Regions:
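Generic preference for hydrophobic/aromatic residues in regular secondary structure cores
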Residues: 11-13, 20, 67, 130-132, ...
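The feature captures the catalytic groove of carbohydrate-active enzymes
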Residues: 4-23, 135-141, 177-216
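Acidic/polar, glycine-enriched structural segments that form the non-catalytic walls/loops
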Residues: 1-91, 161
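Glycine- and aromatic-rich loop/turn segments at beta-sheet edges
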Residues: 69-87, 122-136, 181-203
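Secondary-structure junction/capping motif
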Residues: 29, 168, 172-175, 195-200
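Tryptophan-centered motif/residue detector
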Residues: 33, 41, 94, 185, ...
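Generic, low-specificity signal for short hydrophobic/alpha-helical stretches with a mild N-terminal bias
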Residues: 26, 45, 83, 95-102, ...
Length: 216
């Protein structure tokens, strides 16, 4: 390039086995894919304008786009994890970060939200390892993630078919709640214990945020 000259360059991180995706990407130029991406996000969020604080509207939309960018998907269009610290193929999982990344989908992207619900149904409860016993009370708020996402999804979209298609999902959520409710002693307040918040110890007898998740 000559001094002060510029040129757009497309960069694709792709699975070489998914040659159809690569061919589709190469069939159009950078401007086309940029416009397609912007149109997609406009269809979900519209154009948010806040006259008293224009930057706030822009930052909110940007945060929404970053949440989308946090997820890794397989060639079969299934969630692998989130690059905000979560990949199930490693022994280190920060489910709390991934849960926050999932929240925007409960309002705008039902298909992706359903994939998140199924992911947390499988990975939300800490498995037994060499250092920790795991289980529902390892991190109660993480264990409740599948229930909170399911509730938010149903509250906004009001769609029952997804849950009817996955009867084991309802049974698992019911079992989690039953385990939590039965953990309370008769002379205790209606509050519940947890060992960890996510990757930090929950100090005190009852952790406030965890119990807010429980009652959500």
């Amino acid at each position: 390039l000559q001094p002060m000259e510029q040129k757009r360059v497309s960069l694709l991180f792709g699975d070489p086995n998914r040659y159809q995706d690569i061919e589709m990407f190469l069939s159009k130029d950078t401007d086309f894919w940029m416009e397609q991406t912007l149109q997609y996000f406009r269809s979900l969020t519209g154009e948010l304008k806040m006259e008293e604080d224009a930057m706030a509207g822009m930052l909110l939309q940007r945060a929404y786009q970053q949440a989308f960018g946090a997820f890794a998907m397989s060639g079969e269009n299934e969630i692998l994890g989130s690059n905000w610290g979560t990949y199930p193929v490693t022994p280190h999982v920060w489910n709390k970060d991934m849960y926050y990344s999932s929240l925007p989908f409960t309002l705008t992207e039902p298909e992706l939200c359903k994939k998140c619900i199924l992911w947390f149904a499988k990975y939300g409860i800490k498995y037994k390892g060499t250092k920790f016993e795991g289980g529902v009370f390892h991190s109660l708020s993480n264990s409740l993630s599948v229930i909170m996402l399911s509730g938010a999804y149903y509250e906004y979209f009001g769609e029952k078919e997804f849950f009817q298609q996955h009867p084991k999902l309802y049974k698992k959520m019911k079992a989690i709640l039953q385990t939590v409710l039965e953990s309370r002693e008769e002379n205790e307040p209606y509050l519940y214990r947890t060992t960890w918040i996510s990757d930090a110890y929950a100090l005190g007898k009852y952790h406030t945020g965890t119990n807010l998740c429980m009652y959500r």
